Amino acid sequence: MVPRIVNPLDEMLFKEVLKEQQRIKVYIERARYGKVKTIIEGIDEKEFDLEEIAKKLKAKLACGGTAKNGRIELQGDHRDRIKKLLAELGFSEELIEVE
């Protein structure tokens, strides 16, 4: 349950703390015709705009992708770069598991 926050500064601090507590799992899935997708799960879609995070990641990685079903899907294998990029967005690197 999220506490009621009145002060906008408190809300920003609360979101930063939430980012640092997210357990994120990154792995790949095989799609049709041998194509690969990088899947990012574990980001709370009620607290964070998955579409906005996906948009930033797609721009940095120069790939296509989407946010659906509570996860982010990126075209291609980006496991080697995704941990650093999520850390730049404020998520804790220690809580990002890359398979």
Swiss-Prot record:
Keywords noted in UniProt: Protein biosynthesis, Translation regulation
InterPro entries with a match to the protein in the record: DENR/SUI1_TIF (IPR050318), SUI1 (IPR001950), SUI1_arc (IPR022851), SUI1_arc_bac (IPR005872), SUI1_dom_sf (IPR036877)
Please give the CDD domains that the UniProt record associates with this protein: YciH_like (cd11567)
Q: Which GO terms describe its molecular function?
A: mRNA binding; translation initiation factor activity
- Gene Ontology annotations of biological process type: formation of translation preinitiation complex; regulation of translation; translation reinitiation
Q: Which domain of life is it from?
A: Archaea
What SUPFAM superfamilies is this protein classified in? eIF1-like
User: Which family does the record claim for this protein?
Assistant: Belongs to the SUI1 family.
The record's section on PANTHER family has:
DENSITY-REGULATED PROTEIN (PTHR12789:SF0), DENSITY-REGULATED PROTEIN HOMOLOG (PTHR12789)
**Name of the protein:** Protein translation factor SUI1 homolog
- The source organism is Pyrococcus horikoshii (strain ATCC 700860 / DSM 12428 / JCM 9974 / NBRC 100139 / OT-3)
The organism's lineage is: Archaea, Methanobacteriati, Methanobacteriota, Thermococci, Thermococcales
